[in-house]
Amino acid sequence: MLELVSVSHIYANGVRALDDVSLSIPRGMYGLLGPNGAGKSTLMRTIATLQTPTEGSIKFGNIDILQHPEELRRKLGYLPQDFGVYPRVSAYQMLDHLAVLKGIASSTERKSVVEGLLGQTNLWAHRNKALAGFSGGMRQRFGIAQALIGNPELIIVDEPTAGLDPEERNRFLNLLAGIGDNVVVILSTHIVDDVADLCPRMAVLANGRVQLEGKPSDLIASTRGKVWKKTIDHSELDDHQAKFEVISTRLFAGKTIIHVLSDSQPAGFEPVEGGLEDVYFSTLSTLRRAA
């Protein structure tokens, strides 16, 4: 269990990136959903001991990670949003080098670990290829391979599917699902479907605060009977936004489909089965209206 209590982080320029964040994250896949600039990457870096919060405490099991960050690092696998590699080095060589840095001194043990990870991430056929020649999806799979060195108990992946094509995204999410049963895996993303497809529990982070937390199914149930849709001309959008709590819009065949949140059915609207996307957008809409 990962426990965060009243974690805040204020940068030197006065920006409060995290504001009183408290979370209990159990074993399994946990989704952290939020827009760009919500504070997700700051929170991931803080949990990964790359920066110290201004206030609050973080514990992983019996480890106080603020007091003993080196203990957490021995149990941590981290795939940041952006990571660099030596472009002319092969995947095999790079994983072997990283395994040495992780403390695996035995060449026989490293060989077993590296070959196993290359197979697990479906990169064995590309083991001798220079990393510079990897596609975006292959780079992300390499990233999770390096994060799995040393059998970590806590794995953090930050925006892992951004920029991947649908096939690579599905392959990567299937890989995550396969490792998420016995360890804590935090999936930080702005892509709703990533969380909906994988995570038994989730939180919505926006403006540096936890706005919503729970099981996706429970959060979806909270909007049941409250989400309505209507197809309008784009020229009518401003008028509808003034009259209703519009939580999402999308273009389809030259028309605009809007979803609104209302306790009763507005005239001209039809009911729609709400999903996690409606929960997410309604949360952000409420914040915008309160600003």
Enumerate the predicted regions with their spans.
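Walker A (P-loop) phosphate-binding loop of ABC-type ATPase nucleotide-binding domains
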Residues: P35-G39
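Conserved ABC transporter NBD signature motif
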Residues: G56-Q67, E71-L72
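ABC transporter nucleotide-binding domain
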Residues: R171-H259
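Helix-to-loop junction immediately C-terminal to a conserved catalytic motif
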Residues: A48
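Conserved structural motif at the start of ABC-family nucleotide-binding domains
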Residues: L2, A17-L18, R73
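Conserved ABC ATPase "signature" region
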Residues: D96, V100-G103, T108-H126
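Catalytic Walker B motif of ABC-type/P-loop ATPase nucleotide-binding domains
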Residues: I155-E159, L164
